[in-house]
Amino acid sequence: MTEEIAAEGLSRNIPAFSRFLIAATLSNAQELNFSHVADDAGLARQTVQAWFTILEETMLGEQVLPYAKTVKRRAIERSKFYFFDLGVVRALRGFPTITDGSSDFGPFFEHFIFLELAAWRDYRSPQSKIRYWRSTSGYEVDFILDDKLAIEVKSKTKVGDRDLRGLRALAEEGTISGFLVVCREPAARLKDGIGILPWQVFLERLWAGKLF
């Protein structure tokens, strides 16, 4: 990390890098738009792109690449970005209160599930790939694991039909075999071939190797 920081001159530009980090947290768990982050931080786009690379190389964050194997609906080509720790995001945002119903609760819940997926991959299945899918028409699925399992994360305690739109749209492509919603419902159930799992059950099955 010291070499990367020295190479980019970060030690001489701490205020700018601090602005970058704060702006980067606003894109956490979202599509990564270097130009928007650059505008928010008052920096050049090329600088922001290079600094995101440093975050990845120093394992402070990770880009999730888009899943592009759809035909009926064209996929967005931007990656999503997740910091390595929820506490870091919260600290850089000034320690906002994260409560059920707050605007940050859903993205933080999604981030929490991503961190579990990433940990499972790193420790149990290093060859596995985590992707996400979003169509140009607005359909989205939060995670796709190994091009086999589509996972939508909802912080709700009751999942409705509208919450399944992205999974159903992806199912029409015929490229994915399994579909799950990870949520805060009290019990597992099945809805039109889509598994709806409490997050605790999902994590138990993930770490037990019973998702596929």
List each language-model region with its residue ranges.
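Short beta-strand/turn micro-motifs composed of small residues
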Residues: 134, 181-183
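Accessory nucleic acid-recognition modules appended to NTPase machines
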Residues: 1-149
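Short active-site-adjacent structural elements
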Residues: 140-141, 159-162, 187-191
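Conserved beta-strand segments of alpha/beta enzyme cores
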Residues: 129, 178, 193-195
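Short, charged, amphipathic alpha-helix that recurs within catalytic cores of restriction-modification
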Residues: 156, 162-175, 179
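Active-site ExK catalytic segment of metal-dependent nucleases
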Residues: 146-159
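Domain-level recognition of nuclease-like catalytic cores that cleave nucleotide substrates
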Residues: 186-212
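Structural beta-sheet core signal
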Residues: 150, 180-181
